[in-house]
Amino acid sequence: MNVAFHTLTALAIGQTAACRIDVADRRGRRVAIAILVFLLGVMSHGVLDGLPHEYPFKWLGDTVSTTSLVVIWMAIVQPRHRVLLLIAIAGAVVPDVIDHVPRDLNRHLGTHLPELTKLFPWHHPGGSGSLSGTVAPDARIASIANHIIVVTFCTVMLWLSRRALRLRPATGG
């Protein structure tokens, strides 16, 4: 899936976990939660890439939407939670960094980085749900449905964990 969807999922993971951390928590507990958040980010990448999907955003749209999500969320989340959200994002994008960045840099910038065998199973043809070329109508519908499910799930998780945000509810009167 586009990086924007991996990032949205990571924000939902990180913000939900942020609600489970208290300032008074032991350092060991905070570190354990951070490690878990990173691993959940990596695992979410596998789940999303395993779903049948097309890429609704080209590279520029993906870059702009991903950057916007991160900038906006860093502005509205409580400052003490920012690192946890960045850890979740790192976990969610590290599979692409490891498996795709050397190839992409070689292709687009003419570098000569070694291109190793893909580490993550969901980046192999048999493990990826990536749809390319001529896509059957049923597969396109499945892709759209999967994107809607991901966005809906993340939106609900972000709403339920909104106490991690700096936003204050309006007071009546």
Walk through the language-model features, giving the residues of each:
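N-terminal membrane-targeting hydrophobic helices
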Residues: 1-173
